[in-house]
Design a protein with these regions (language model features):
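All-alpha amphipathic helical-bundle segments outside canonical DNA-binding/catalytic cores
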Residues: 262-272
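A cross-family kinase active-site recognition segment
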Residues: 114-172, 194-196, 295-298
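Active-site acidic catalytic loop and adjacent metal/ATP-binding pocket
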Residues: 34-53, 86, 184-232, 326
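A glycine-centered beta->alpha junction motif in the catalytic cores
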Residues: 58, 102-115, 158-165, 279-298
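Active-site activation/catalytic loop segments of kinase-like enzymes and analogous catalytic loops
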Residues: 228-259, 275-291
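ATP-binding pocket architecture of kinase catalytic cores
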Residues: 45-141
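ATP/Mg2+ or Mg2+-diphosphate-binding catalytic cores
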Residues: 3, 163-164, 281-326
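Conserved NTP-binding catalytic cores of kinases and kinase-like/nucleotidyltransferase enzymes
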Residues: 1-88, 212-214, 324-326
Length: 326
């Protein structure tokens, strides 16, 4: 398999054959869903309800790490927390076909939430408190831990090694990110005082779907060990005052099930900085996958890097500036 273009052999026929091998009688309907890191399809079945198949990116996760993701989701579901868990075939959630590893999920629809009301924010907060309470019961063994080295320094090096930006900007980017990551690392010393646990890892509004019954959480692909604030800060938006108000609502629900350490609020801007650096590195690392140049053509343009540099300058000011306090 070509890991630079890992999905070139994943044809609709292979997808359907894989689903049949996992015990599903398909009716021939295959709809590609919006996903870049993995490939995700909605597949019609003769049983009635469509299912969703996720084909994991080759080379990214070990089998043990994927099974640990599945076990975490099953553990949450056993506590009646609304997460979408993979279907089992002969007791197994992870399958393989033609060199691809995949899992099959029930289709669970919904809309992306606005989180524009106190009720919605408290509702999500309650579930996050319950998720983290379960997450602290044990540790991951085969999945990563959130770190400045992984999300920051290794990501920065990937960008610089790829010669993505003009020479005049590359030196400035290297200097700026060195200062920024030094500052993030200094502030991240407080992570040692944070109680780490199993968390969702990529908890933004796009990974929450809402129905008349409330929210449910999808895609635990990035679950890892980390501080609780990582699953909260991406749900905040707007000015400091607006984010403070939103966080008050989230924590009102959260703390019905688990006490939140206010000291973790100092990690919000450092975590945002890491996400900004890591996002560009993610695109750089995936550029040989043909889906990425098609979806993100602006990434290879100097203008993107100029804007990214300015955003990192502003983020350095945010990291060293006043912290969000309740």
């Amino acid at each position: 398999m070509n890991l630079d273009a890992p999905y070139c052999e994943l044809s609709p026929e292979v997808v359907l054959d894989a689903l049949e091998a996992a015990g599903h009688r398909c009716d021939g309907r295959v709809l590609a869903l919006n996903s870049y890191e993995n490939r995700v399809y909605q597949i019609g079945t003769e049983e009635g309800e469509p299912v969703v198949a996720k084909f994991y990116r080759p080379g990214r996760w070990s089998d043990a790490a994927i099974r640990e993701e599945h076990a975490f989701s099953a553990e949450l579901a056993s506590q009646e927390i609304p997460v979408v868990t993979p279907l089992l075939q002969a007791g197994e959630s992870l399958h393989a076909h033609n060199g691809f590893r995949y899992a099959v999920f029930p289709r669970r629809g919904g809309r992306w939430p606005e989180l524009g009301t106190t009720l919605e924010r408290e509702w999500v907060g309650r579930f996050l408190g319950r998720i983290h309470a379960v997450g602290r019961a044990q540790r991951f063994r085969d999945r990563g831990t959130l770190s400045v080295a992984g999300l920051g320094r290794e990501a920065r090096d990937s960008v610089l090694d790829g010669n993505w930006m003009p020479d005049y900007l590359a030196t400035k980017y290297a200097d700026l990110t060195e200062v920024l990551l030094d500052e993030v690392e200094a502030q991240a010393d407080s992570w040692g005082g944070a109680r780490l646990g199993r968390i969702l890892g990529d908890c933004h509004r796009g990974n929450i779907l809402w129905t008349d019954k409330g929210p449910h959480f999808v895609d635990l692909d990035d679950c890892l060990t980390g501080p609780a604030i990582q699953d909260l800060w991406m749900l905040l938006a707007g000015s400091q005052q607006e984010m403070r108000s939103q966080l008050v609502d989230l924590l009102k629900g959260y703390e019905q099930f688990l006490t939140f350490d206010r000291g973790e609020l100092a990690l919000i801007e450092p975590l945002r900085a890491l996400r900004m650096i890591h996002y560009s590195a993610w695109l750089a690392r995936r550029w040989d996958d043909p889906a990425f140049p098609r979806a993100f053509p602006w990434f290879a343009e100097p203008r993107y890097w100029e804007e990214h540099y300015r955003a990192l300058e502003e983020q350095l000011a945010a990291v060293t500036g006043p912290r969000l306090e309740l």
